[in-house]
């Protein structure tokens, strides 16, 4: 709590008046980070014309997020880093899982416009999601968004390959 109040430059009572528990504070952090990413994605999405571009906008929004200036350098997905600190089945961990599921659902929604086979849509959405999250983990370890750029190119290759069959 002392670290949080010092970083936020607020009195402890202000923190206690706004959050009834540490869990509630963590939930607010996760919700804020999720909304931050959704806003980045929405800005990218507004510039797209095709379903393929909309899917790649998900990768671009992750790239944008990685490019933010971080005090201690980029260390990967803040939500996954936070989730690693939570016990299994905690509300914070579940909130992070829901965010990741929503990102995959966004990809699947756009894939539905490209592919007719719903099982294929589900499989490719999972594949792209794993590619996205794995590249974010590597980017965090390396402190560079280079892996996200490579993942975007790989995603584009997957989409080109899949869409020529449909």
Where would I find each of the regions flagged by the language model?
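Short, basic, alpha-helical segments at the C-terminal edge of helix-turn-helix-like DNA-binding modules
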Residues: 31-38
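C-terminal peripheral helix-coil segments that are non-catalytic and often amphipathic
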Residues: 64, 101-113, 117-122, 138-166
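Cytochrome P450 catalytic-core helices
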Residues: 132
């Amino acid at each position: 709590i002392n670290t949080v109040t010092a970083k936020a430059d607020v009195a402890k009572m202000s923190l206690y008046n706004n959050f009834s528990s540490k869990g509630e504070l963590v939930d607010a952090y996760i919700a804020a980070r999720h909304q931050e990413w959704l806003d980045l994605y929405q800005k990218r999405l507004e510039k797209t014309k095709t379903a393929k571009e909309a899917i790649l906008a998900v990768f671009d929004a992750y790239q944008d997020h990685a490019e933010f200036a971080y005090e201690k350098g980029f260390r990967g997905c803040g939500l996954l880093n936070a989730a690693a600190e939570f016990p299994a089945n905690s509300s914070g961990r579940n909130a992070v899982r829901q965010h990741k599921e929503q990102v995959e659902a966004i990809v699947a929604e756009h894939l539905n416009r490209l592919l007719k086979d719903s099982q294929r849509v589900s499989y490719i959405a999972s594949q792209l999601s794993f590619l996205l999250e794995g590249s974010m983990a590597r980017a965090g370890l390396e402190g560079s968004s280079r892996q996200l750029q490579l993942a975007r190119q790989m995603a584009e290759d997957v989409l080109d390959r899949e869409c020529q069959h449909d």
